[in-house]
Amino acid sequence: MARLSPGKAACWMVLGLLIPSLTESSILNSECPQLCVCEIRPWFTPQSTYREATTVDCNDLRLTRIPGNLSSDTQVLLLQSNNIAKTVDELQQLFNLTELDFSQNNFTNIKEVGLANLTQLTTLHLEENQISEMTDYCLQDLSNLQELYINHNQISSISANAFSGLKNLLRLHLNSNKLKVIDSRWFDSTPNLEILMIGENPVIGILDMNFRPLSNLRSLVLAGMYLTDIPGNALVGLDSLESLSFYDNKLIKVPQLALQKVPNLKFLDLNKNPIHKIQEGDFKNMLRLKELGINNMGELVSVDRYALDNLPELTKLEATNNPKLSYIHRLAFRSVPALESLMLNNNALNAVYQKTVESLPNLREISIHSNPLRCDCVIHWINSNKTNIRFMEPLSMFCAMPPEYRGQQVKEVLIQDSSEQCLPMISHDTFPNHLNMDIGTTLFLDCRAMAEPEPEIYWVTPIGNKITVETLSDKYKLSSEGTLEIANIQIEDSGRYTCVAQNVQGADTRVATIKVNGTLLDGAQVLKIYVKQTESHSILVSWKVNSNVMTSNLKWSSATMKIDNPHITYTARVPVDVHEYNLTHLQPSTDYEVCLTVSNIHQQTQKSCVNVTTKTAAFALDISDHETSTALAAVMGSMFAVISLASIAIYIAKRFKRKNYHHSLKKYMQKTSSIPLNELYPPLINLWEGDSDKDKDGSADTKPTQVDTSRSYYMW
């Protein structure tokens, strides 16, 4: 290859320096449109290559037409935020134009933009106009166009050949229009498209093969489209897709079948969808996935076993700001060796299992702050010397339970508590307290619980039948996770369904009350109180608990008997293992409401009441027996008179007592000593000992407890 002499080389160098100066001088010396700015500015190509371009900036000038004295050397023309609705031929002499910005103007039709013969144009901005349709071949002259921004318009119709001629198009923004369908024929003319943003359109739905022609697409944004379902073959053909966003849709489950058709996906955004749970198979064998976002999901309650399975390149998982996410299975992750960052803050999590963390060998940082953490054996691993994991914002990690540790920092509490086993705790948001179902539908109730050792979960139906994973039934089916399925639900299936989580330490329960077509049958009452005997000054009550629903090892923190009428109310704490109660010092011929209320450690309560009237005080009537039969009529007449007088006397006495017992009883009770109930009876009460156990203990023959109501709290 011939070499230049030093003199010639110097000449060429000087010439190279002069050419840009001459170009800049020509544009600056030519007449620049009034109020516009004409200068050389940095410019980046669609491939992000740095260049310098001759730029005419006429933004924000309220222009109604394009200035007529534009230089033919113009490469970038900026006319953003004006009032231009139509062009004539002002653009025809701009043969070097590479970027044109008409965003925020008043165009209603693409033909009125005047794009003919702009063969060098690579970037076109038409966002925020009033364009309503794209007709066939409306952009066919833009053979070098690489970026088209036509988002935030009023486009409701795009013809099949609207993008014809755009074989070099790399980026297409169609988001925020009024499209109701996506037609795969649009993309036949854009085989090299790499980025497609088509979100925020009111499409009826995504169809199978919708994006099949886009084999080179790398990023697809389907955000804010109210999508409720993604068909299994909707993403077929997207073999190069690396980034996919379903942000802010209405998906109720992970579109796992569709995701399996995207083999090279690296970044997946499912944020802000009402997905209820992440379950086995949802994210499986996605061999290139690196980052997953499941944030801001208002209905997400659990991440179940093997929900994330065989994801060898996943390095970051974000599952934050999910107000109902209260459960992550200890085996939620399987074969996820590369995960480094696990973000779980601002959820409703009580704990994260140590085994979950141990299944992630490369984990470097975890964020579980701003969760209602239970400071017991389940999270002891946090203070373990075996872990080198960095906790994000550790000063924001506070105990929410047990009550004695509430508000304290987690690490301070765990130093004090070293227990290895703890009671089950059912996650409270996994299923609702009340539901109204339509006849014939299938109901799923998800019950999840955390404890050490891991609890067994079973359900009890309104009639007391126990449903386990081994139960064989056409009506009920229980998954190993704790989800109860009730098929073909009918009116007779209404009632209270109880989830029981049990381990060697005890049990926890939660109840879902199910109505069917607005109807709730009365056969589901758990606690029932009865009147066994009534006297003038006392009432003997007893109660029955459905032992199939409330197991004998369920501990209750309080149980209270309350006697109430319009004039006086008093209460008494019920002793341990009592099933009968004798209420004394009552007034005769008086109406009372008697209620038994029990509460457990989770403030769940059961209550049963009965109305009863005490008997009238007895009067003795002695009537002489006359022997003569002739006096029988007189005796009968006397008896009638006596009975009449007695009835009147009883009525007067009853009125007198009702009028005055209030003050006399108050005076009587004020003389008695006040004894706190927690000194009379133990603070922890177990009411649910089965009748069969009671018989074994020989307690069935014991006399009912005599309770002097004068020693109860006196409330007005």
Curated annotation (Swiss-Prot):
Coiled coil: none annotated. Glycans are attached at N69, N96, N106, N117, N385, N517, N582, N611. It comes from Rattus norvegicus (Rat). Gene3D superfamilies: Immunoglobulins (2.60.40.10), Ribonuclease Inhibitor (3.80.10.10). Keywords: Disulfide bond, Glycoprotein, Immunoglobulin domain, Leucine-rich repeat, Membrane, Repeat, Signal, Transmembrane, Transmembrane helix. Disulfide bonds join C447-C499. Residues 691-700 have a biased composition (Basic and acidic residues). Residues 26-631 are extracellular. GO terms for biological process: positive regulation of synapse assembly. LRR repeats lie at residues 73-95, 96-117, 120-141, 144-165, 168-189, 192-213, 216-237, 240-261, 264-285. GO terms for cellular component: extracellular matrix; extracellular space; membrane. This is Leucine-rich repeat neuronal protein 1. Its main location: membrane. The chain crosses the membrane at residues 632-652. Residues 653-716 are cytoplasmic. The keyword Repeat applies. Residues 424-515 form the Ig-like C2-type domain.
